[in-house]
């Protein structure tokens, strides 16, 4: 029997007032628990009313209570909650981080994709900084070599679209989360805008089911071996794996961290798997890394594959795809 059954509109005498159960509920919930209201209605109607029926009707009328059972007396916020990151339900997923097109390492990316294709992987997550957007950088400009020109925005976007198209020839679905480089576009626009602008720029506006761009900076893989948080965190630490270990303890799940251009794997203090998945950009093409010395660690290329629910961390030297191809 549904909550809209006729007895909800049956005239009753309750609390010395002639009313109906539906109308009585609208004020009674302010002072009574659902169990108490069910008992009062059972007595007034001469039939058994279950507390869960009262709860369902109360909720359908928008009469909310707190977790402690108190009535919610303030108007609910009309603004969205940001608690639904993109989720991939699979045991086999490829993660590419910091590709930074048009400065990608084509050979490295090709080797990684070849292995993923060999293993029958259908989904890839782009873990932030898919685009470099050098032309939108707010960093100080530099001197150019005599035969060098600065990248134009149109050329960067075109290269990103070509890379995206190539991915879709190997994978059924691409999930792209944001990184700090994509945020350069927002800083230049100086306004909040939909991720659909990136969809259009990459030429994927008619392919939104296969090439998904999320406003989140992380995604979650729901695998048979647990939850795996693929993230492009705000922080980039000098000590490899530090950010990932802290995030694993904060969110209580396995973590694959991008952004730091570091590489390695470990476990968190609570025993969760942590990986810094390296970058897919060609470090030799990054002016800030090559033209001036710094004390930051050497950039490490890499990629991550969840294969049959288990982690495989790839590296050009220490774990090359050729080991499995």
Please give the residue ranges for each predicted region.
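DNA-recognition alpha helix
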Residues: 35-46
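Major-groove recognition helix of helix-turn-helix-like DNA-binding domains
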Residues: 47-72
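Core catalytic region of metal-dependent phosphoesterases/phosphodiesterases
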Residues: 96, 101-209
């Amino acid at each position: 029997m549904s909550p809209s059954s006729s007895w909800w509109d049956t005239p009753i005498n309750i609390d010395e007032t002639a009313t109906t159960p539906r109308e009585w509920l609208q004020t009674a919930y302010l002072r009574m628990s659902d169990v108490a209201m069910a008992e009062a209605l059972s007595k007034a109607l001469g039939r058994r009313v279950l507390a869960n029926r009262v709860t369902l009707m109360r909720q359908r009328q928008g009469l909310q209570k707190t977790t402690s059972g108190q009535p919610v007396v303030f108007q609910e916020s009309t603004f969205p909650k940001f608690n639904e990151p993109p989720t991939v339900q699979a045991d086999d997923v490829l993660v590419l981080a910091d590709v930074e097109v048009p400065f990608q390492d084509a050979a490295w990316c090709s080797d990684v994709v070849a292995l993923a294709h060999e293993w029958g992987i259908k989904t890839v997550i782009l873990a932030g900084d898919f685009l470099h957007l050098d032309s939108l950088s707010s960093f100080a400009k530099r001197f150019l070599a005599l035969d060098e020109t600065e990248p134009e925005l149109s050329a960067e976007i075109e290269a990103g679209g070509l890379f995206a198209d190539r991915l879709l020839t190997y994978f059924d679905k691409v999930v792209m989360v944001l990184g700090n480089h994509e945020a350069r576009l927002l800083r230049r626009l100086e306004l909040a805008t939909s991720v659909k602008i990136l969809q259009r720029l990459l030429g994927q506006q008619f392919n939104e089911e296969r090439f998904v761009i999320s406003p989140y900076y992380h995604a979650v893989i729901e695998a048979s071996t647990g939850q795996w948080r693929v993230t492009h965190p705000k922080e980039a630490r000098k000590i490899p794996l530090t950010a990932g270990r802290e995030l694993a303890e904060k969110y209580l799940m396995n973590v694959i961290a991008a952004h730091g251009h570091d590489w390695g794997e470990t476990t968190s203090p609570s025993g969760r798997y942590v990986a810094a998945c390296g970058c897919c950009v060609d470090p030799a093409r990054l002016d800030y890394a090559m033209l001036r010395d710094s004390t930051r660690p050497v950039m490490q290329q890499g990629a991550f594959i969840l294969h049959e629910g288990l982690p495989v961390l790839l590296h050009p030297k220490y774990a090359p795809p050729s080991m499995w191809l």
